[in-house]
C-alpha cells in the first residue's frame, strides 16, 4: 500500500516571480506528498546544477520545463514501484539515473522536488508529522533563528557589499519568544529608518534595503533598534551576524576583495589579510556571533587564516565554500577551515545527501545551519528538517514576506506539538565556540 504509483511535476513560480518546480508523489494507499524547490541569487560555483531551459523567449531563459519533463518522463518511470518509505534507495536511484557528479543531466531541481515529495508522502502514509518521520523519537530542538533584517549585496540595491545583516535572539527562553523578539526589533528598525528618511522597501529575503553610509552604519542602526525594542545586545539578549557573500565581490585576477562593486567609488579594496583584519575589527567592536562566507569560496588559505584568527570566538559558516557537499566539508574539516556549514537542500539535491552533510558536520564538532534560498516558495520543509536533525539553527529570512514567514509559522506549530519535550537552546546552539 506504500508503493509509489504516480509522480507528477509542474512549473510554478517562486518568490521572485521566476519559474521553479513543484512535484507530487502518490501511493497505492492514497498517501500524497508535494515538494517545491527553492532557488538562489548568489550561488556557489560548485553547487549542484539547477536545470533551466535557456529559451530567452520564455521567462527570460529561466523556464524549468526541461526539469519538469525529466521528472515526468524519466524519474517517474524509474521510481514508480518503490516503497515510498525507502528514502535513501529512491534518492540513490535518482543520483545513479543522473550519472553526473553535479546532477547536471536531470537537474538538481528535478531530483530535489521528487526527494521532498517522497518524504512528505511517506509521512502522510504513516500519519506522522514530517519532522517526526525524518528525525524519529529524539526530535526535540527548535532552532535559533538567524533573521536577515537588512539586505545588501546581490539581494538588494542597497550600496553595501555584505549581503545580509542578521539578528539572533540567543537569550530567548523559547522559539515562540525568539520569534517575538525578532519581530519587535524588525518593527523598531522600520521606525528608525523612517525617522532617518531611509527607504523601508524590503529585499528578496524580507529585510530592509536602505542606503546606509556603510557596514558600521548598518550595525549601529540595528543596535539602536534592539535597544528601542526593549532588548539588550549580547549573549543574554540578541546578537548580530553577517553573510558577507565575499565571493560576490572577490576579484580573482587581482586577488582582492573589492567592496566598490557594491559600494561604489568609496568602497575599500582589501587583500585576504586585510579582509581578515577588517572582520576581526568588527567582531571586537560589536556583539557578532556568526559570519558566513567571510572569504571567497576558493580562497582556502584565507579561510584557514580566518578560522585560526576568529574560529574560537565566532561561528564561521561555509555556504558557497561548502555548498552542502560532504566532499568539500571533509576537506574543510581536515584543513581546519571554517567551523560551521550552511545547509541548503538545493545545493546538493536530495534529502539523503543533506542529512549526510549535517551528520558529518556534527561528528566533526562543526555546527549546521539549515537555510532557505533567496528565491523561496510556501514550502516549509526546511523547518521540519531543522527540527528533525536537532540542527539548532535556521536561517530563513526576515519578519516579512509569506515565503519567509511560512517557515517560522511551521516552527511555531512544531513547538506546540512537541510541548514539554521542545527545547530552545539559544546561545548553546553555538556549541563549538569558547565562551
Curated annotation (Swiss-Prot):
Q: What is its main location?
A: cytoplasm
> Might you give the EC number(s) for this enzyme?
4.2.1.11
Question: Which positions in this protein are listed as binding (2R)-2-phosphoglycerate?
Answer: 163, 344, 373-374, 395
**Active-site residues from the entry:** 205 (proton donor), 344 (proton acceptor)
- Keyword check for Cytoplasm: yes
Which SMART domains does UniProt cross-reference here?
Answer: Enolase_C (SM01192), Enolase_N (SM01193)
The alphabetized UniProt keywords are: Cytoplasm, Glycolysis, Lyase, Magnesium, Metal-binding, Secreted
- Per the record's keyword annotation, is rRNA-binding included, yes or no? no
An example Gene Ontology molecular-function term = phosphopyruvate hydratase activity
List the catalytic activities from the record.
Answer: (2R)-2-phosphoglycerate = phosphoenolpyruvate + H2O
Organism of origin is Streptococcus agalactiae serotype V (strain ATCC BAA-611 / 2603 V/R)
Describe the task this protein carries out: Catalyzes the reversible conversion of 2-phosphoglycerate (2-PG) into phosphoenolpyruvate (PEP). It is essential for the degradation of carbohydrates via glycolysis.
Please list the cofactors this protein needs: Mg(2+)
Instruction: Quote the subcellular location field of this record.
Output: Cytoplasm; Secreted; Cell surface
In which pathway does this enzyme or protein participate?
Carbohydrate degradation; glycolysis; pyruvate from D-glyceraldehyde 3-phosphate: step 4/5
The note on cofactor binding and number reads: Binds a second Mg(2+) ion via substrate during catalysis.
GO CC terms: cell surface; extracellular region; peptidoglycan-based cell wall; phosphopyruvate hydratase complex
- Highest taxon above the source species: Bacteria
Name of this protein: Enolase
Q: Which family does it belong to?
A: Belongs to the enolase family.
NCBIfam families in the record:
eno
BP-aspect Gene Ontology terms: glycolytic process
